[in-house]
Amino acid sequence: MALTVVGSIAFDAVKTPFGERERMLGGAAVHFSLAASFFTEVRPVGPVGDDFGEEQFELLRSRGIITEDIERVPGGQSFFWRGHYDFDLNVAHTDDTRLGVFETFEPKLSAAAEAADTLFLANIQPDLQRQVRAQCAAGFSGLDSMNLWIEIAKDSLEAAIAEVDCLVVNDAEIRMLTGEANLAKAARAVMKMGPRAVVAKRGEYGAALFTADPGTEADAESHNFFALPGFPLEDVRDPTGAGDSFAGGFFGYLDGVDGDLDEANLRRAMGYGTVLASFNVEEFGTERVSRLEREEIDERFEALRRMTQFEAVPAPRN
């Protein structure tokens, strides 16, 4: 199996109450690819500038990530984001954004990227997401977005959502997109647009999965619902990229099981997404995930499974 992801490949400068870093490797496609690489062959697509050196390429290649579709633009500068977090790590404050070569990005997939079994469209302009989707005949596709595109390009975003199988956004964004305060109603509204699955990311509180059975209408009776909490951690240093790491674990696992999208696999994918996100936040940027071992992932997955299950024992009656 093979997975293509299209999105930002960047440098980040981040300050939290627990430390700070200057110009560390980041971007949605990077965090996604590192997480997905534990399960499948992953190929990120995106532009970088001359400032993206061999050190950054080698970090990705050391994880088996195929870098042939990362386009280095001569004379250009890579996407750069500077932000900070206060003690509420659920809220990122943007201090500076420099699009660099990403401003003129026109995605053109290689033959290998087009042939991927799974496609993930990270948070980029919706019209670009549609351009990529038209180039790739992947059997399973997903999309992430943000409040900016809901505000300024809602029609284009809804058209892009209609062309994918799974929408992955945070709970505030899905409510904003649909105008529904209730999360279940909001997910149902999204599924009426086309996707058969909706994942609502909820930060430190975990994630919720809504799915419709194949061949059924998007009504309440046909919905499946599953939710997991965030993995409990005593030390959280930097949440940047956690949502992308979640998506990488989720889609990477599904591609690794040959795209078998039954309900059981979707729920296991939620578990692996949750686990990868939990490792991501333990240190800054890619520091933790880039040296993570598969055994650590499986151990934490099993710990998460144990802490979220209970026996169905009838309650005593008075």
What are these regions (language model features)?
Residues 34, 81-84, 206-210:
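Short beta-strand scaffold segments in enzyme catalytic cores
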Residues 11-23, 38-120, 134-139, 298-318:
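Conserved N-terminal subdomain of the carbohydrate kinase-like
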Residues 36, 170, 243:
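Short, conserved phosphate/pyrophosphate- and ester-handling motifs at nucleotide-, phospho-/glycolipid
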Residues 7-9, 245:
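Active-site metal-binding loops of divalent metal-dependent hydrolases
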